[in-house]
C-alpha cells in the first residue's frame, strides 16, 4: 500500500526541482511531477514555435520555374497562361513576405489576376493547382450567384466565408489564401452607358467585389447568408488574399477587332479580320474589358490578364493521359482494383476529344464522355469472373458499341454489339 501522506511533503517538480511548497500547484503524472511554473514555460515555448511556423509559412516560397513545373504535372498546354500565373503568384507571396518589421517606404501593391478563355480550357484547374502548390486555403465562387446588398442572392462576403471554412476558421491562414471567382464576365454591365435602372447582378456586384479586391476589413456572417443586427461577425482583412477571376468573355474578340479596325481606317476595312480569335485575345487591352462591361475601377484592381487557348484534339488527348491525375489513369486504377486491365485505343482517345469539342465543353466534358462509355462495364465487371481486360475503341465512343472484353487467355468474350 502507498504511504502517500508520508511522502507528500517531499514531492518535487521533476523539471525544475522545486518543492511543492515553493509552487502554487504540482501536477502528478506517471512517476513524475510538474509544477505550474514549468507548465507556463512550456506553454510559452509551444506558442513561440507555432508563431514562428506561421511566420515562416512562405519562407520556402517556390520560384516561378518551380511553380510552372508543378503546374505542368497537372495542366497540359496553356504555356503562356501558366508562365504569367507563376510569375504573378510568386510576386504576390513575395510581397507578403516583405511585409512586417522589415517593411520599408516602398509599398508593393497587390496584383489580382484575370483568366480569359473558353469553357473547359483549364481556368479553374489552374487556380486549384496553384493553391495546392503553395499549400494555402482555396475557395471557388460563381459570380452569377452574387447580388448587391439588399437583393435576393449571395452577398460578396459569402465568398470570404468559403475561404475561412477552407482554412478551418484560421483567419491568419485565410488572409493569405486564394479565391477563384468564375463567370466574372456574366456581371459585366449590359452596355457601356450607365443604366438609370438597377443592375442587380452587374455593376452593383462589381462595386461590391471592388471593396474586397482592393483590400478591406470585411465583416462575415459565420453561418453565411445576410447580415443581421446583433449578429456576431468574423473580421477578415482581404489585403493579402489573391483573387483570380475567370470568364469566357464570349464576343470580346469582336470588341478587340473593332478597336483594331479603327486603327486601320484608310486601308482595307476587313484588315482586322486577318486575326483569328486566339491572336485577337493576345491583343486584349483594359479598354476592351471596359467596352465589354467591366467598370474602370474594377479593371484597375485586376492588372494581370492571362489568355487561355481553345484546346484542340491533340491537347485534349494529352489531358486524358499525361497529368498525374489524368482521367485514363484514374479509370485504369479503378478497374485495376477489380483485377481488370483497362485500355483505350488511340482512336478512342481521339473520339473522346472530338466529342468534347463537338459539345463545346473542352476538358470539363471529358469525364462525362468516358463515364457514359464505361458505366455498364463498371456495373458488370465486379460480378464477372471471366473478364480480365477491357478495351475501349472509337466505336465504343461514337457508336455506343460495347467495349471489347477479354479473358485471361486473351480470348474475346463478346462480339462488341451495340449497347441497348
Swiss-Prot record:
NCBIfam families: clpX, PRK05342.1. Component of the ClpX-ClpP complex. Forms a hexameric ring that, in the presence of ATP, binds to fourteen ClpP subunits assembled into a disk-like structure with a central cavity, resembling the structure of eukaryotic proteasomes. Pfam families: AAA_2, ClpB_D2-small, zf-C4_ClpX. ATP-dependent specificity component of the Clp protease. It directs the protease to specific substrates. Can perform chaperone functions in the absence of ClpP. It comes from the Bacteria. Zn(2+) binds at residues 13, 16, 35, 38. Keywords: ATP-binding, Chaperone, Metal-binding, Nucleotide-binding, Zinc. GO terms for molecular function: ATP binding; ATP hydrolysis activity; ATP-dependent protein folding chaperone; protein dimerization activity; unfolded protein binding; zinc ion binding. This is ATP-dependent Clp protease ATP-binding subunit ClpX. The gene is clpX. One of its GO terms (cellular component) is HslUV protease complex. One of its GO terms (biological process) is cell division. Belongs to the ClpX chaperone family. Residues 1-54 form the ClpX-type ZB domain. It comes from Staphylococcus haemolyticus (strain JCSC1435). ATP binds at residues 118-125.
Amino acid at each position: 500500500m502507498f504511504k502517500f501522506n508520508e511522502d507528500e511533503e517531499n514531492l518535487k517538480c521533476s523539471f525544475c526541482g522545486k518543492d511543492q511548497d515553493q509552487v502554487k500547484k504540482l501536477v502528478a503524472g506517471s512517476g513524475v511531477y510538474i509544477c505550474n511554473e514549468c507548465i507556463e514555460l512550456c506553454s510559452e515555448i509551444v506558442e513561440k514555435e507555432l508563431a514562428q511556423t506561421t511566420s515562416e509559412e512562405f519562407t520556402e516560397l517556390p520560384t516561378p520555374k518551380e511553380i510552372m513545373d508543378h503546374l505542368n504535372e497537372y495542366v497540359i498546354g496553356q504555356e503562356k497562361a501558366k508562365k504569367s500565373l507563376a510569375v504573378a503568384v510568386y510576386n504576390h507571396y513575395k510581397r507578403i513576405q516583405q511585409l512586417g518589421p522589415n517593411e520599408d517606404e516602398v509599398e508593393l501593391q497587390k496584383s489580382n489576376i484575370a483568366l480569359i478563355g473558353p469553357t473547359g480550357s483549364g481556368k479553374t484547374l489552374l487556380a486549384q493547382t496553384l493553391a495546392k502548390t503553395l499549400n494555402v486555403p482555396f475557395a471557388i465562387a460563381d459570380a452569377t450567384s452574387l447580388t448587391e446588398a439588399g437583393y435576393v442572392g449571395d452577398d460578396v462576403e459569402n465568398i470570404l466565408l468559403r475561404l475561412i471554412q477552407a482554412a478551418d476558421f484560421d483567419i491568419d491562414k485565410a488572409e493569405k489564401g486564394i479565391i477563384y471567382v468564375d463567370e466574372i464576365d456574366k456581371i459585366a454591365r449590359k452596355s457601356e452607358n450607365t443604366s438609370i435602372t438597377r443592375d442587380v447582378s452587374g455593376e452593383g456586384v462589381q462595386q461590391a467585389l471592388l471593396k474586397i479586391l482592393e483590400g478591406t476589413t470585411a465583416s462575415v456572417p459565420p453561418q453565411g447568408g445576410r447580415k443581421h443586427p446583433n449578429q456576431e461577425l468574423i473580421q477578415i482583412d482581404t489585403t493579402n488574399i489573391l483573387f483570380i477571376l475567370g470568364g469566357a468573355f464570349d464576343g470580346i474578340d469582336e470588341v478587340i477587332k473593332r478597336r483594331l479596325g479603327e486603327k486601320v481606317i484608310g486601308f482595307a476595312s476587313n484588315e482586322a479580320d486577318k486575326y483569328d480569335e486566339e491572336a485577337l485575345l493576345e491583343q486584349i487591352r483594359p479598354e476592351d474589358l471596359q467596352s465589354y462591361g467591366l467598370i474602370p475601377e474594377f479593371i484597375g484592381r485586376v492588372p494581370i490578364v492571362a489568355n487561355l487557348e481553345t484546346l484542340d484534339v491533340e491537347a485534349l488527348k494529352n489531358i486524358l493521359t499525361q497529368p498525374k491525375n489524368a482521367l485514363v489513369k484514374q479509370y485504369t486504377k479503378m478497374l485495376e482494383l477489380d483485377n481488370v486491365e483497362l485500355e483505350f485505343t488511340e482512336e478512342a482517345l481521339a473520339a473522346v476529344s472530338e466529342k468534347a469539342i463537338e459539345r463545346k465543353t473542352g476538358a470539363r466534358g471529358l469525364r462525362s464522355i468516358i463515364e457514359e462509355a464505361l458505366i455498364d462495364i463498371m456495373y458488370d465487371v465486379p460480378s464477372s469472373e471471366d473478364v480480365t481486360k477491357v478495351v475501349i475503341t472509337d466505336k465504343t465512343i461514337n457508336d455506343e458499341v460495347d467495349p471489347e472484353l477479354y479473358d485471361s487467355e486473351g480470348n474475346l468474350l463478346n462480339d462488341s454489339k451495340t449497347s441497348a
